[in-house]
Every structure is written in structure tokens, then in C-alpha cells.
């Protein structure tokens, strides 16, 4: 896949690039924080993508204006998609079976958390809810 670099500016200890997609079929680089999800990582011209914002991509080294090959970490992207889907499944079962609303979700690199609107969730309830979610996943 190829991407156009429209500009490159120093950004803290790294560089911020404004990108332009060359064709309609190029995979878009997904930004951090959109919909509560983690953003894409990968490489542009073998330079590591460190962070993705709505209007710029933060990379580890400087690039001149032009067209470059890029790749995304598909394993990371798939993991993010699975976590996002699991959050919806967990939230749906929590609401349906326990009348608990999801009031917050934070997806992390190592750990993700869901906040439910109750101060009295027991360890047994968490175990039971997790079991129902895992059973629903196995049925799919």
C-alpha cells in the first residue's frame, strides 16, 4: 500500500506527518482514541508509526514530501477489533441479565476495563457474567 506525505514537522522528539491516501482502496490508518479504541501502528517507509491523531501521524524519523509504502500491524488491529466486540457482548449481557449499564470502557495495550453502574458487584457475579460471555463467544 502507498501513502502520500503532504508535510512533515518536528513534534517533540519525533515527527508529525500529514498523510494523503493515494487510492480509494488504501487501508486508512485508524486514530487513537476514536470510539474508545486504540489506534493503528505500523510503518511508513520502514519508519515506525508511534501514534495516530485525527489530523496527523506521529512517526519516529523524518520523511520528505512524497509517496511511500506503508504497512499496518494487522495482528494489533485484529486484537483491537476483538476487544471492541467483546466489550459490546459483555455490556449487552450485563444489561440484559443483571440490569447493569456500561458507563465507561478503557481499552489498553495490556489490560482493558469496563465500568458498570453498581457499587455492589460481587466476585461471584463477575465470574458468572464472564462465564456467560465466554459461552456466548463459543456459540458463535
Indicate where each model-derived feature is located.
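A glycine- and charged-residue-rich anion-binding loop/surface
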Residues: 1-140
Amino acid at each position: 500500500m502507498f501513502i502520500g506525505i503532504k508535510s512533515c514537522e518536528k513534534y517533540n522528539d519525533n515527527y508529525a506527518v500529514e498523510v494523503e491516501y493515494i487510492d480509494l482502496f488504501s487501508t486508512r490508518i485508524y486514530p487513537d482514541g476514536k470510539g474508545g479504541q486504540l489506534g493503528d501502528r505500523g510503518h511508513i517507509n520502514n519508519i515506525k508509526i508511534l501514534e495516530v491523531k485525527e489530523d496527523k501521524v506521529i512517526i519516529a524519523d523524518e520523511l520528505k514530501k512524497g509517496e511511500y509504502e506503508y504497512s499496518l500491524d494487522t495482528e494489533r488491529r485484529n486484537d483491537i477489533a476483538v476487544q471492541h466486540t467483546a466489550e459490546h457482548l459483555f455490556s449487552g449481557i450485563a444489561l440484559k441479565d443483571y440490569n447493569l449499564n456500561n458507563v465507561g470502557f478503557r481499552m489498553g495495550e495490556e489490560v482493558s476495563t469496563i465500568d458498570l453502574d453498581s457499587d455492589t458487584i460481587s466476585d461471584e457475579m463477575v465470574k458468572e457474567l464472564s462465564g456467560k460471555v465466554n459461552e456466548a463467544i463459543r456459540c458463535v
